[in-house]
């Protein structure tokens, strides 16, 4: 498995945006099911240039889905990684550059 095949895509939902905006920042990715935490950490560092503090993983097991036939189908097995980066570090996972925070100096 190559280092570029580890991180498949970021997971962007309301829940993950809430986690992303807190300190320390945590980013959620769909990863290759065969990747371990060390591979995930190396891939994140190679792609984004930031060494993660921690990597937590969870496996979403296949669930039964309705197919409209007698035989049930199953969803795919997915592995999800929650990657924690150091304080003050911001990563642009959507392709946009992070905007610098502006302090409001206009007090009345």
UniProtKB/Swiss-Prot annotation:
Coiled coil spans: none
Protein origin, superkingdom: Bacteria
NCBIfam families to which the protein is assigned, alphabetical: PRK05738.3-3
A GO MF label: rRNA binding
Family to which this protein belongs: Belongs to the universal ribosomal protein uL23 family.
Leader sequence residues: none
Protein name as annotated: Large ribosomal subunit protein uL23
GO biological process: translation
Record key words, sorted: Ribonucleoprotein, Ribosomal protein, RNA-binding, rRNA-binding
Self-association state and partner proteins as the record states: Part of the 50S ribosomal subunit. Contacts protein L29, and trigger factor when it is bound to the ribosome.
Transmembrane segments: none
């Amino acid at each position: 498995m190559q280092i570029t095949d580890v991180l498949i895509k970021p997971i962007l939902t309301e829940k993950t945006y809430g986690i992303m905006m807190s300190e320390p920042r945590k980013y959620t990715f769909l990863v290759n099911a065969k990747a371990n935490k060390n591979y995930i950490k190396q891939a994140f560092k190679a792609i984004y240039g930031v060494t993660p503090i921690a990597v937590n993983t969870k496996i979403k097991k296949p669930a039964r889905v309705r197919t409209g036939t007698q035989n049930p189908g199953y969803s795919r097995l997915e592995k999800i990684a929650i990657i924690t980066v150091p304080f003050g570090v911001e990563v642009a996972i959507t392709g946009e550059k992070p905007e610098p925070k502006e302090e409001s100096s206009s007090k009345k």
